Amino acid sequence: MNASLSDFTILEADAAELQQQLTHGNVTAREMAALTLAKIERDNPTLHAFTHVFADQALASATDSDLRRSRDALRGPLDGVPLAVKANLAVAGWPQHAGLAFRREAVVSDDAFVIGKLRAAGAVLLGLTNMDAGALGATGRNAAFGDVTNPRAPGVTTGGSSAGSAAALAAKLTTLAIGTDTIGSVRIPAAYCGIAALKPTSGAISTRGVIATHQRFDHVGPMARSMRDLATLFKVLVGWDRQCRVSFPLTFQPLRPATTPSRVGFVTGFDTLEPDSATLDGYNRAIAALR
């Protein structure tokens, strides 16, 4: 790795920045994977963000990415980029436990549809992330695998149920992550952990290979530390899966500058709620900043 590029700096990079460093030869995909795995080993015993880590597979995948780069045969913007996967998605050879104690040994033989897309894109899969049991919760607490710690505010909930994915991103234990969302499970932890996430249009991303909470309302959601990474990851994940009953063909529309000024709506009265003064002050300051 380039001596001018510190470990901390490269771990802070989003996927777009990491690709620039990889292209310029300042770091290799294997070096990035090794640094990320070392940080997971150091910090995860406290954070409980990951339940399983694919160390050997991740290093092998990163090495393959470096080889493709040397042959000018990259598979796209995710090639060589570390990525964490919520544990209710099927990853071949690993338990699809969904945060449930009785599924600790439920090793699956096939990948979820989106995992296949991520492998084809060259992403480096790091491991399975912790979650509220059965995706039925919004706190990140889990009796079987440990409560997920919020890296930005230890002692404060991470939100959930995609708690481990959000915490891993906030703690720089991964560059990208996958979560799922039925009634807020990527949006809530993203807000609580200070990262970005997207609940996509229903059917835009296949849910085949995801343990269902409610088939009609379940979504696979990209999670990242920047909006541009969300767009990049969404573009890879989106696509019709003829074996998924809720999937439909969708043409990805790239981000483009707005042609008219943005408008933001906000609530001025909380007749049925009593937010504390600090929360209300932060809310009002955010409104003022957006004006």
Label the model's feature ranges.
Residues 110-237:
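Short glycine/serine-rich loop segments
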Residues 199-281, 285-286:
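A short helix-breaking turn/cap at a secondary-structure junction
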